UniProtKB/Swiss-Prot annotation:
Basic and acidic residues composition bias: residue spans: 108-135, 151-172, 225-254, 265-279, 300-309
Organism: Candida albicans (strain SC5314 / ATCC MYA-2876)
Gene symbol of the encoding locus: EAF7
Region feature Disordered, mapped onto this chain: 85-445
Keywords, alphabetical: Chromatin regulator, DNA damage, DNA repair, Nucleus, Transcription, Transcription regulation
Biological process terms in GO annotation: chromatin remodeling; DNA repair; regulation of transcription by RNA polymerase II
This protein's name: Chromatin modification-related protein EAF7
Length: 445
């Protein structure tokens, strides 16, 4: 509240502002500026807002108090100048905006007019070109369009290159379309001429007719391009499928050839195994023959030794004939006549520990082929030695004579079963035969 000074009563003193009131003043200044044309109206609003927040005990603020406080803080004259300049600028901007909007409308109108003129010009140019082409085509015969032949390289293109084919074909398809377009233009020109004769030409009707013609031409061109593009794609697909089928057939033939080679290898391996088995069986048969021959030689050697001993006791010793591996029949007969009392021993006559002699089956020693072998078993190649009838008659006569003259000598000989490795027969001296010699065969294996 303003108070009068005692020394100078005409002057009013400044009112004291609290911090809360100053804060309210500053916040209101942000919304309502006390400058420019509306400064009085804004000051009233500020005063009313401040007085509403005061208590009933405090006096309300006057307009003078608010202006004094603002002058102490701000330079109000400069603020007024700035606000005036800003208002002038805003007014000029508004005027310029109005002018620019008017000019923009004018330019739009001019542009629209230009576009309409530009659209009319190409239509007229097209008309003239169509007329010239129709005249030239009527004078000269139309040449058939040359079709482009596809090379072998084009057929082997990948699927990625399929996108490029319609573009390439559209270039040389334009030539074909132009000839068709010329014929269409003839028909269109004739139809338009008929209409113009019947009806009076108007600018609106001419524009519509030209637009419809251009749209029809473009649609026809697009249809032709689509049809040809579909045909080319179908051809390329057929070629790709044929190539895939050829590749499959080649792979199948190669696989069949490989299978035949593998079967031939298996058959050759089986033949080799059968041959190896045959050779092993042949070797086993030869070994059995050798063993049989060795056994016979050992028995013959023992027989000749005993004959020599008996002959030395009865008569003077005779020179021994040199034994060879192959004995003739004459030597056997001589030995039999010189010693009639001694019983000739063979495989069947020799007694081993009072047991009947068991004939050795050479076929039992043969190796058995495995069950998986393919080749059939071969017959044994060993020769079985048979005794003639004359030898049996001579032995019976000798046995009857020896039974009358002297007691038969029974020699017990312990032998081992002949095996593949045994090349000798161990002979132990017994009481009945004190001097029994066993000689090793000189045959080399």
């Amino acid at each position: 509240m303003a108070t009068l000074d005692e020394n100078n009563p005409s002057k009013q003193t400044h009112r004291h502002w609290s911090i809360e009131n100053e804060i309210k003043l500053f916040s209101l200044l942000c919304d309502y500026k006390p400058a420019g044309k509306n400064k009085q109206h804004n000051i009233k609003i500020i005063i009313n807002n401040i007085n509403e927040s005061l208590d009933s005990k405090e006096e309300p603020f006057s307009e003078y108090d608010v202006w004094n406080k603002l002058r102490s803080l701000y330079d109000l004259e400069k603020i007024d100048q700035i606000e005036e300049l800003s208002t002038e600028n805003t007014s000029t901007e508004e005027t310029t905006n109005q002018v620019s909007s008017g000019s923009a409308n004018i330019t739009k109108d001019t542009k629209n007019a230009k576009t309409t003129l530009d659209a009319k010009e190409p239509i007229q140019d097209k008309k003239e070109m169509d007329k010239e082409k129709s005249e030239s085509s009527s004078l000269s015969t139309p040449e058939p369009p040359q079709r482009r032949t596809r090379s072998a390289r084009d057929t082997t293109k990948s699927k990625r290159n399929l996108r490029d084919t319609p573009k390439e074909k559209s270039q040389y398809n334009d030539e074909e379309i132009t000839s068709g377009g010329a014929e269409k233009s003839k028909v269109e020109v004739s139809s338009t001429s008929d209409h113009t004769d019947d009806q009076s030409p108007t600018p609106g009707s001419t524009k519509k007719g030209l637009d419809e013609q251009t749209n029809d031409d473009m649609s026809d061109i697009e249809d032709v391009d689509k049809d040809k593009g579909d045909e080319t794609i179908a051809k390329i697909k057929k070629e790709n499928t044929s190539e895939q089928e050829e590749d499959k057939n080649k792979k199948q033939t190669e696989e069949e050839a490989e299978e035949e080679e593998e079967e031939g290898d298996h058959v050759s391996g089986d033949e080799r195994e059968s041959k190896n088995k045959d050779t092993s069986e042949d070797e086993d048969g030869e070994d059995n023959e050798d063993q049989d021959e060795d056994d016979v030689e050992v028995i013959e050697d023992s027989h000749t030794d005993k004959e020599n001993e008996s002959s030395s006791e009865e008569s003077s010793p005779e020179p021994m004939t040199k034994r060879t591996r192959q004995r003739t029949r004459s030597t056997h007969e001589k030995t039999e006549h010189t010693s009639p009392n001694i019983k000739k021993r063979t495989r069947q006559s020799v007694k081993f520990d009072d047991k009947p002699a068991e004939p050795s089956d050479t076929g039992s020693r043969k190796r058995r082929a495995p069950p998986g072998s393919v080749s059939p078993p071969h017959p044994p190649k060993t020769r079985r030695r048979t005794r003639s009838v004359t030898h049996e008659i001579e032995e019976e006569d000798a046995s009857t004579q020896s039974a009358d003259d002297a007691e038969p000598e029974i020699i017990k000989v312990e032998t081992r079963h002949t095996t593949r490795r045994s090349s000798r027969i161990s002979m132990e001296p017994s009481s009945s035969t004190p001097n029994v010699r066993v000689r090793r065969s000189s045959r080399k294996r």
